[in-house]
Amino acid sequence: MAWSQLEVTKAHVAYSCVGIFSSIFSLVSLFVKEQLYIGESMVASIFGLIVGPHCLNWFNPLSWGNTDSITLEISRILLCLQVFAVSVELPRKYMLKHWVSVTMLLVPVMTSGWLVIALFVWILVPGLNFPASLLMGACITATDPVLAQSVVSGTFAQKVPGHLRNLLSCESGCNDGLAIPFVFLSLDLLLYPGRGGQIVKDWICVTILWECIFGSILGCIIGYCGRKAIRFAEGRHIIDRESFLAFYLILALTCAGFGSMLGVDDLLVSFFAGTAFAWDGWFAAKTHESNVSNVIDVLLNYAYFVYLGSILPWKDFNNPDIGLDVWRLILLSLVVIFLRRIPAVLSLKPLIPDIKSWREAMFIGHFGPIGVGAVFAAITSKSQLESHLTNEETPLKDTPGRGSKHWQVMACIWPITCFSIMTSVIVHGSSVAVIMLGRYLSTVTLMALPTGRTTNTKNAWLERLPALDKSGRPFSLQRLDKEPSLSPGQIGGRTSGMVATPKLGMRQRWRQKLQDNKEIEPDIEMNNFCQGTFQIRKETHASTNDSHGTTTANLGTSNGRAQGLPWRSKMNIIDRAEAVNTIYGLDKLAEDTENKDVWRVNTSRIPGIRSPYDDVYTYQSDSSSIGSIERQRIKSLREQEQQAYIAYTEDDQVIIENRQGEILEYVKFHKEGLGDAESGLHNHDRPKRAISPPLEKLHQITNEARKNKYYAYKVGNDLVIEDESGEVFRRYRISPHGGKRKIKKIINPVSSVLSSVGITKPRGVSERINHYLLHSEDEMADDEAESENDMDYEDSDGPASRFKDHAD
């Protein structure tokens, strides 16, 4: 060139191409993903095709050297990082709680997809025998964790239920490693035909026992040691924040290195290492607000799919010499999209606990993207076939030509895999399935704090709740609108604690009222309730006019109410999210009859203002010990896992999840009858319980428009929740009890719900309330045993300071 400063190299051009694409796409990424519904993998692959050797030839990785070797190692690193990240982000002890669902997706569903693809490859591609077709099917059977991120993370994830996101994440992270047994079984059948003993010995002893089982154990050891090491370093304050956040990336590289050196399944090593590393949820809680992993994943995805788009074998997609034609590949792609997973998942839906409806089964069956994992499996298979033909290091730079043993298999495996990947990128990367699922889901985010949109700040709605301002005062909560479902002679009210019985008894008092007022309707209680409501409206109207000089707009309600309705300003205005959260929590509280201990209520603190010590629960006896602090942290995590976060409806059911995507309640409404149809409340860890028909209003709220408002106010000791039209959804009576009891301090998940209606939850509750939660006594024992092991690696200052940071 004229000037030596302008001389460029291939590497410099590659850096520029990847950098330009990443910069431009990052600037419009939200528009592309939200408005065009296109994922970054599709756009990056198209860009790689344009600048690659097939179009502009600016970016040509085929001229860098051994392309297969480069692609294999890049795919290995990307997969190990992504698989480790997926396992770390799962809820704590996820594999222990959901192993049935994960196993059903990994074993029967993968096996079915493998056999179906192999059958159609054998039919469509001439010249390939069935073992070779099994090898083709094994390469494109696994679900890719990189492409699955378009559903399990980001803005698209808000349209998918949390339990489905967790299930897809776990499956995509684990089945890439479990594709290795299918690959090597196919290789053994292809390389050792008619030698059953050799096939069984190699597959069981080498593939299953060494590569898979020992690889999983090795991953657990690496993850466990890494967890202990980072907790020790953090407890001694010898690790900085940057290294703390990057530590899991370092562990992922460690898994890739040791797995490759020992000849085990490095993807399984990475997955189980991440699972063991984040088993107790401590690391996830520490890095909850950090997005370092997401940033690194995005950069790697941009670069990888630009690279992949530039090396696609476009000429081989229509190459009759190796038995491939475009129409054959199109038919095979349709089989992969529609028959690989959907029939198996639909048929096994009753056996998968985490799939609650046929629509969810259809979504899980459809969303099985093929991507980086298929590239890794295809090049690994090709390398193994080449190793039986030469003593050179594999994979080879050039594929053996016609006449070599298994030459057609080695020539077809890469084009078939790449065509399947591009089809999956187009279908799954566009996220059409996610958008369609979101149209049928009516979701509502549950918040634990009031919105604070009251217009009369002088009379906060906390002040209008029952006067339970004495700390430690017991109370009972009873639903007044609940239809009687108990047999005569049983107690009619279900309370949260001690039953408050009047001196004369409820029936005697009622008979006395009937005798004294025979000409008056028997619903005296409701008349008093209406009088109290009218008095609130009257007083609020006066206070509103005095303080603001304005009235609310005419809402046009019925039921004989005033047209202006200025009394609304005194009520607490809540949206439908908070209404669902309040009703859900208070119904659960009112129906709890197994716990006979009395709760203590404290309404001295304004709701919405959290104390930095709210998440720290201490015992009076051993509050300063390290073991107690660790147990308190675990109890705090368990409490957070029981807080309702989102509810959504699907067909005739309401599913309530926590922030981690775990299902708290599963409410199914049977539509067989009109008014007397019974409802069932199902929980995957609890037996079936009956609920009253008024709970169907929860189903109604979640299906309403998001702009609807609801009102919560107090009339005497009654807590009322109603909508804009005046329909009362719930009435609760909070009955204070006499006397006090000393109760050991513990926690209950209904605290956040009580806080949302102005009642600060008891600082004390019997520990037997934990039996009501999803966790069993065995899990609690495991948590406590695990906390005792972690005590040895922490000093008295470290855990306390870290726990305080977590509480903040």
From Swiss-Prot:
| TM regions (residue ranges) | 12-32, 36-56, 70-90, 105-125, 128-148, 174-194, 203-223, 244-264, 267-287, 294-314, 319-339, 361-381, 409-429, 432-452
GO terms in the biological process aspect are: intracellular potassium ion homeostasis; proton export across plasma membrane; regulation of membrane potential; sodium ion export across plasma membrane
Name a Pfam family for this protein.
Na_H_Exchanger
Tell me which stretches of the chain form a coiled coil.
none
Task: Please state the protein's primary subcellular location.
Answer: membrane
Q: Which UniProt keywords apply?
A: Antiport, Glycoprotein, Ion transport, Membrane, Sodium, Sodium transport, Transmembrane, Transmembrane helix, Transport
Q: Which domain of life is it from?
A: Eukaryota
What does UniProt give as GO cellular component?
plasma membrane
Q: List glycan-bearing residues.
A: 291, 545, 602
Gene3D superfamilies tied to this protein: 1.20.1530.20
Q: Does the keyword Transport apply?
A: yes
Which ranges are annotated Polar residues under compositional bias? Answer: 542-561
Cite the GO molecular-function annotations of the record. potassium ion transmembrane transporter activity; sodium:proton antiporter activity
The UniProt annotation puts the region (Disordered) at 478-499, 541-562, 774-808
- Where found, per UniProt? Membrane
The identity of this protein, by name, is: Na(+)/H(+) antiporter 2
The scientific name of the source species is Zygosaccharomyces rouxii
